[in-house]
Amino acid sequence: MSNHSLIKKSMLALALTLPGIAMQAQRFVVFSDIHVTPGNANDTKLREAVAEVNKGNYDAVIVNGDLTNEGSDEQIANVNNILKEIRFPLYVLPGNHENNWSQSATKTVIDTFGGDRFVFEQDSLVVVGINCGPFMKMGDGHIKQEDLHWLRSTLDKYVTPGKKVLSFNHYPLQDDLDNYKAYLAILADYPVIGHINGHYHSWKRYDAGDIECAMVRALDMRNNNYGYTIVDVSPQWTHIYNKNIGKAPEAKFAFANRTKHKPLKLASGDTVITAPKGFTVDRVWTDSASVFTRLGFDKNNVYFANSLGNVKAVNKNDGKLVWSINVPDKASVFSRPVVLDKNRVAIPYASGLAIVDSRNGRMVKDYKSKEGPYVADGILTPEGAYIQGGYKRIERRRPSDGKLIWEYDSLFNYCQAAPAIDGDDLVFGAWDTNLRCVSMKDGKLKWVWNNGKSANMLGPGNVVPVLTDDKVIIVAPDRYMTAIDRKSGKQLWRDNSHRYRESLGHSADMKKVYAKTMDGELVAVDATSPEFKELWTVDMGLGYEHAPCIVAEKEGVVYAGSRRGIVTAVDPAAQSVLWSLRLGDSEINGIDIDPESGDVFVSLIEGTVYRIAKQ
């Protein structure tokens, strides 16, 4: 052991055993991963922990994500009622369980706690926290673009000579966040003495760059070990303690309050992307916020919406903004705009469904949601039928003005993916474990299927089904591909020879189904066979994958999108990868084909839109 390491270890041991230093500190309680649902054990133990905290002396209490299990309005209201009893200033960040499975499309948690980020000052300390994602679909954590801008501008404002910064996020400053390097690069420019996260329900000391970080406990650490974290910040040290309810604090980590860091250089966002041979690649748009939607098209424009509730029409040829409007509730939008008839565009959003004029964005109609948000991708069929999934319902609306024609409202959770339609069959999944087929004519139920599992998160809630003449084929997070008789709804076969999830598509002639697996493979399956018949598998070299991005075939090329900004093109005839193209670091929202030009368009969560054209 070097002398430097020995000295550092001795100083750490001394810091952890000097109670006098801790008593002089700014002191915070951190609750992380409390996972409260009404009446569960965590509900009871959180109440006990809050009562214990109220007997102490703290400067603030920070709740660092995963307040609930499913982010429902009921669960958020319940945990808020418990947290309101805390007598100290309270600051709350959502976690992936509030962002990913949300009854309100993340709106309720923001409204309840006044936002999804915070900053406050305590003497010479600036404490700052931002949201982690992932947002309303399976994905890696992601810091929204507007939150990165806010973080820098906020630290510019608050950090004056003599100030130190303590950072909070539910996710670690590691590869769990697709854009953690951009996040870290900002923090490294300021006197950040530490970063504190949860998520893994475990203790861990680690470095991000040269910033010291701590992964801290959950409310429930098993074996009846319920508790929270105490953080003390003194002029020279930050101390982190494990506090089991009813027991004395136990020292875990101590950080030397280092305030100068090595700058982290990032690649320029203007980096030129080299197009694969035989293709052109153009960046159509770069947004100042994050984009969670797929894309809609008409003759001139591409349409999408962002995390600030801005809906935009951009000329797809020259990349110029045609118009931009805010949805009425200004909440993040997760559904793609749907181009309708007579210069009309439907914009599903958290609180309703807006119909706007495609030429200027002028609001024509605004239909308020009966219950819950619209997060599903709607569809306009070639025959002119507009179908839109919602919360606990799916609707057919008039394509001229969005007026409701019928609704099927016997769902138990929200729709998310676009439905599949052929003839009178409308097939769609919902996050209630079920796949349903209803009549296009009147919305009456024809059949319902589920995989027999009770967990909503294992059902076909975010997959676009494939319809053949006699089958419905799906994949789901239970890691099966399933074929169902299209007429009766009876299960024909199931296969788990690959780790399927939610990414599915089909060949142009409907004879093959393509699935992207969790191992980064593209699997081709015979859609005409009465039994499961694998045709071929290509390793796309993506490694671990979970992005629900659909697979699409155009002009003899199969396109798949990844969780880390890569679009891969596969030649189905040669059964080989043509090319893989990195367009960014974040998830590809979808592979969308422009019906006018046949070009492939993709949007990335980081806010960019690209066009890929075959020459």
List PLM regions with ranges.
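His/acidic metal-ligating clusters that form di-metal
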Residues: 53-60, 139-212
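Metal-dependent catalytic neighborhoods of phosphoester/phosphodiester hydrolases
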Residues: 41, 65-84, 99-111, 176-182, ...
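Extracytoplasmic beta-rich repeat domains
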Residues: 275-296, 324-339, 366-380, 406-422, ...
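N-terminal active-site segment of His-dependent metallophosphoesterases
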Residues: 22-78
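Short coil/turn segments that connect the beta-strands within blades of beta-propeller domains
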Residues: 299-300, 342-343, 382-384, 423-425, ...
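Short loop/turn segments that connect beta-strands within beta-propeller blades
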Residues: 315-319, 357-361, 398-402, 439-443, ...
